[in-house]
């Protein structure tokens, strides 16, 4: 196995550390491609302080381990993760774009006038790129594990009164032979509101530890606070209308439910 350490210098980020591109120096991409020709499994460990353009690196390696700037325990942590002494369970707090030209790419960006949806995907006059997918390469909340998990969300009510809480019940099972942890994430979308609202907002999450074959049930309560926002008058309000609830293991890998909220508060 080849463990290939790539990334940024720490002075390339932070205050007064702006760059015009989020690609690494080209020599690092060339090195990754060369190492792949050696016929050995390649694991890239990535040291960086920001999301990078990593598509080429991911495609020229067997695994990519995001370490950020890990400090003095970097060697021990890396050895534990790669040897299996520790099981990865972290999730990305930022989306990684397909390419530099896709930034800014946020999971919670505001809706556009002609958003791309599964129903109109492929049409020309919707908000999309012609040469790359709309989705980031690695979405917010993404992260892999040596374990494999299966999620099942109980049916949600179709209607909800203003001021009431929405209860979400999720059953998670470790269907692998390795003990591990997974992060269940719950997002919310206000489909139509008096002001432009994000396409998705993280409202709840919980990291669950499971032994091999173990199953647990996790319950979330989304109170009226989760449905509320500040309007143009800077008043915190909850408005009626259709809401979408997303439950999954990242901002993209989700099951979708619709709940109609009625009345005014």
Regions found by a protein language model. Give the residues of each.
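Extended, hydrophobic alpha-helical segments in both membrane/secreted and soluble proteins
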Residues: 27-32, 42, 64, 78
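A short helix->loop->beta-strand "cap" motif at the edges of active sites that frequently abuts
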Residues: 37-42, 61
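Secreted, periplasmic, or luminal enzymes acting at the cell surface/secretory milieu
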Residues: 47-181, 187, 207, 212, ...
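Intrinsically disordered, low-complexity Pro/Gly/Ser/Thr-rich segments with frequent PxxP/GP/PP motifs
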Residues: 194-230
